[in-house]
Amino acid sequence: MEERYLELDRSRKNDFLYPFIFREYIYTFAHDHSLNRSILLENVGYDNKSSLLIVKRLITRMYQQNHLIISANDSNQNLFFRYNKNLYYQMISEGFAVIVEIPFSLRLVSSLDLERSEIVKSHKLRSIHSIFPFLEDKFPHLNYVSDILIPYPIHLEKLVQTLRYWVKDPSSLHLLRLFLHEYWNLNSLIIPKKFITIFIKRNPRFFLFLYNSHVYEYESIFFFLRNQSFHLRSIFLRVLLERIFFYGKIEHFAEVFANDFQAILWLFKDPFMHYVRYQGKSILASKDRPFLMKKWKYYLVNLCQCHFYVWFQPEKIYINSLSKHSLNFLGYLSNVQLNPLVVRSQMLENSFIIDKDSTMKKLDTIVPIIPLIGSLAKTKFCNAVGHPISKPIRADSADSDIIDRFVRICRNLSHYYSGSSKKKSLYRIKYILRLSCVKTLARKHKSTVRAFLKRLGSELLEEFFTEEEQILSLIFPKVSSSSRRLYRGRVWYLDIISINDLANHE
């Protein structure tokens, strides 16, 4: 092992991001980015008040007043935040998130140094679905899994301190403290949960950046210990903190184990330990006995609590068998199923047949129908028990706009849940959306559903079929067994980079 793996990357230590805050194109870029993101439903939280005129007014106010020096006494008297506080705060936070991501992107590109085709491949790994082929390949060979809820840091100043290792710009960090000061009192020890919820809804990109940068710091140390203990080096991992003292402690730790605890050295050499983080949770999975899982669980908990002041609850972290426990993972219920197989061998010379029963492990991904119906009921597509209802609309809405809206939601859900191993629940969701669309149109035209369908014909329902379903219906006859198997097969897409409440049932 070499110490350079624990040194801070100082190749771009002169990054000065503060002047970008006063550039109009930064806010335009942030606005376009939030508008063009891939979503499953509608971006109902999008603020239509964003415009270039408001950006210019915002920048003018930032130039005219000194907002970077603030005390607890005069914060309530600051005219900048008293005037349209929430809108200006949201715009600056989105612009700040775009700006502060610049050094992250530059370090990523310079560290990878890949060919163009490999860069395209790495972009595909951003897709949410890219994790499921990995799970299909690895999880059937594993036995135990632990689902860990990652808590928020107990103090917002910890988020700023983490960012200091990335951004060498005191002005930008001071502005960040000002933003956080306006939402919470930095002298408080605990972040109120209701304020976290409000902050996430109003500034999703800004919060996710701060949260991910903080989580990545302790994950980098966790991965470093894991990779070094297996004598493997990850080319995609760059530890960005100076942890020479920590490195020395690790060497001493390994030396003590070698001298006094030789019998359990295998604990740190298990090649089947896997770590996956998604949203606010992480997964530890292993092939070996639960003893190994307990050791790594307590190491992760102690590392986060002692060095990063993130409070875990070890008693609520359970180690479960993959064959008996389902993971609520990115909108899917995933577990490992034992599928029975029959192997038939026939000897031609002696003319006898040998039948052998066997089992094969397979990752099973199911659409959680009850949470999905709850999401549809919350957005007024059906009632609490799943019966489709008409959705209230404006009287001047065109029929084509209403149909396009329902079709877009239905196709996006079909696109996201195309990896389900059982399509029955997905068919029910499509049925709810189709009938809700018909009832909405019939209500607008003051007609019954039967009369409206009779007048419109079956063309309306054909709009709800996805492009993949239309292609399969043209290539294969529906009566053929090969068509049914292909149509029911799992398909993972590499162009889905975000989800909304219909897929996020947490």
Swiss-Prot record:
Principal localisation: plastid
Name this protein carries in UniProt: Maturase K
Family: Belongs to the intron maturase 2 family. MatK subfamily.
GO process terms (BP): mRNA processing; RNA splicing; tRNA processing
Pfam families: Intron_maturas2, MatK_N
Keywords for this protein: Chloroplast, mRNA processing, Plastid, RNA-binding, tRNA processing
GO cellular component: chloroplast
UniProt keyword tRNA processing present: yes
Task of the protein: Usually encoded in the trnK tRNA gene intron. Probably assists in splicing its own and other chloroplast group II introns.
Gene name, Swiss-Prot/TrEMBL: matK
Compartmental location: Plastid, Chloroplast
PANTHER family reported for this sequence: MATURASE K
UniProt-recorded Gene Ontology molecular function terms: RNA binding
Organism: Manihot esculenta (Cassava)
